[in-house]
């Protein structure tokens, strides 16, 4: 039986594509393994998926771009993770390794290369993360969502592979219940801040609940169960799975962080959106770059977190609603998306 090893983690964005691809390989008779951190979100997501995947936990160290005494300790953690990954590779003898990035992916990528296993990696953002910059040196090929510099000879630009589609599905009963609390004469705004929510969005909704619910139906994916609430013109919930796409479809506008997975999902369904990217003080600036790219393409509006107020947000919402047809036309004309089926076929061809 053919074997494939997946790796990637730290955030949902480093796991999502793997979760989409693994069932395809299982259906085709592959034995699927995953290398990650048992304390990480990658392990949680695989357990929730119920997929027939063997999980191997390794030591991990965070890759920091700044000086910290913890870097010294993490060098040893990464080194031990490489040794653990090498033993896994030598024991399994897989046909390939597919990495979605995140610091946990570096040891398996290095170990795969050392043991002669072809390495395929995927980069979602406009600029490579530190983990993928390291992984690229050991990779057979990198697939990218955005076009990369021509000097990167091992990169193939494939566009975004998303988990949502423009196909309409029957409304879940829970969605029908939510809609009974909404005023259908008001626009619906969805706040989504990634796998852990976004405190800045949560605070905005909390501080201005009265004003917001007078003018909009508000959906707030919080990442915090203590904020759960269903009341007139307001639905706050910590986490959703099956409701994710239905809520996106229900919304007239989405207010989101600038993670590539989410914004390309919005592009796939031509949904109006305002991007509030993580700042450079909290990230490497990749979300700022992603947001600027989407604004330049005419897909979205952006708003820096430092400028986020009720007034500034409402100005963006009003602009999007007033120019809805223009934004949606540009999104529908986009050639930057790839279906999961097409990407899977491309990957299988490269593996053969």
Curated annotation (Swiss-Prot):
UniProt keyword annotation of Membrane present: yes
The entry's keywords: Cell cycle, Cell division, Cell membrane, Cell shape, Cell wall biogenesis/degradation, Glycosyltransferase, Membrane, Peptidoglycan synthesis, Transferase
GO terms of biological process kind: carbohydrate metabolic process; cell division; cell wall organization; lipid glycosylation; peptidoglycan biosynthetic process; regulation of cell shape
GO molecular function: glycosyltransferase activity; undecaprenyldiphospho-muramoylpentapeptide beta-N-acetylglucosaminyltransferase activity
EC category: transferase
Compartments reported by the entry: Cell membrane
Catalytic activity: Mur2Ac(oyl-L-Ala-gamma-D-Glu-L-Lys-D-Ala-D-Ala)-di-trans,octa-cis-undecaprenyl diphosphate + UDP-N-acetyl-alpha-D-glucosamine = beta-D-GlcNAc-(1->4)-Mur2Ac(oyl-L-Ala-gamma-D-Glu-L-Lys-D-Ala-D-Ala)-di-trans,octa-cis-undecaprenyl diphosphate + UDP + H(+)
Entries under Pfam families matching the protein: Glyco_tran_28_C (PF04101), Glyco_transf_28 (PF03033)
Pathway annotation from the record: Cell wall biogenesis; peptidoglycan biosynthesis
Keyword Cell wall biogenesis/degradation among record annotations: yes
Gene Ontology cellular-component terms listed: plasma membrane
Main location: membrane
Gene3D superfamilies given in the database record: Glycogen Phosphorylase B
Membrane topology: Peripheral membrane protein
Protein family membership: Belongs to the glycosyltransferase 28 family. MurG subfamily.
PANTHER family, A to Z: UDP-N-ACETYLGLUCOSAMINE--N-ACETYLMURAMYL-(PENTAPEPTIDE) PYROPHOSPHORYL-UNDECAPRENOL N-ACETYLGLUCOSAMINE TRANSFERASE, UDP-N-ACETYLGLUCOSAMINE--N-ACETYLMURAMYL-(PENTAPEPTIDE) PYROPHOSPHORYL-UNDECAPRENOL N-ACETYLGLUCOSAMINE TRANSFERASE 1
Role: Cell wall formation. Catalyzes the transfer of a GlcNAc subunit on undecaprenyl-pyrophosphoryl-MurNAc-pentapeptide (lipid intermediate I) to form undecaprenyl-pyrophosphoryl-MurNAc-(pentapeptide)GlcNAc (lipid intermediate II).
Full protein name: UDP-N-acetylglucosamine--N-acetylmuramyl-(pentapeptide) pyrophosphoryl-undecaprenol N-acetylglucosamine transferase
UniProt organism field: Streptococcus pneumoniae (strain ATCC BAA-255 / R6)
UniProt lineage: Bacteria, Bacillati, Bacillota, Bacilli, Lactobacillales
């Amino acid at each position: 039986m053919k074997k494939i090893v997946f790796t990637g983690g730290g955030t949902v964005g480093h796991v999502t594509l793997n979760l989409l691809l693994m069932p395809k390989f299982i259906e085709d008779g592959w034995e699927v393994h995953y290398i990650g951190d048992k304390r990480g979100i990658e392990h949680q997501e695989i357990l929730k998926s119920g997929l027939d995947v063997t999980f191997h936990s390794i030591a991990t160290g965070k890759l920091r771009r700044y000086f910290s005494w913890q870097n010294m300790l993490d060098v040893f953690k990464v080194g031990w993770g490489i040794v653990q990954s090498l033993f896994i590779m030598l024991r399994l003898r897989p046909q390939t390794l597919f990495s979605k990035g995140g610091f946990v992916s570096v040891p398996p990528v290095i170990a795969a290369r050392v043991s002669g296993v072809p390495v395929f990696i995927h980069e979602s953002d406009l600029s490579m993360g530190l983990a993928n910059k390291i992984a690229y040196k050991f990779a057979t090929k990198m697939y990218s969502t955005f076009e990369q510099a021509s000097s990167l000879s091992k990169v193939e630009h494939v566009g975004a592979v998303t988990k949502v589609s423009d196909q309409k599905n029957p409304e879940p009963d829970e969605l029908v219940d939510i809609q009974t609390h909404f005023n259908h004469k008001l626009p619906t705004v969805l706040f989504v801040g990634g796998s852990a929510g976004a405190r800045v969005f949560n605070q905005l909704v909390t501080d201005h609940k009265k004003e917001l619910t007078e003018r909009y139906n508000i959906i707030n994916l919080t990442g915090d169960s203590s904020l759960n609430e269903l009341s007139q013109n307001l639905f706050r919930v910590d986490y959703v799975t099956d409701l994710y796409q239905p809520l996106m479809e229900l919304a007239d506008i989405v207010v989101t962080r600038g993670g590539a997975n989410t914004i390309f999902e919005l592009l796939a369904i031509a949904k109006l959106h305002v991007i509030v990217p993580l700042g450079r003080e909290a990230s490497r600036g990749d979300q700022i770059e992603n947001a600027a790219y989407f604004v330049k393409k005419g897909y979205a509006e952006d708003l820096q977190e430092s400028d986020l107020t009720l007034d500034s947000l409402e100005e963006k919402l009003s602009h999007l609603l007033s120019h809805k047809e223009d934004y949606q036309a540009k999104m529908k004309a986009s050639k930057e998306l790839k279906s999961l089926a097409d990407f899977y076929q491309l990957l299988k061809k490269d593996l053969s």
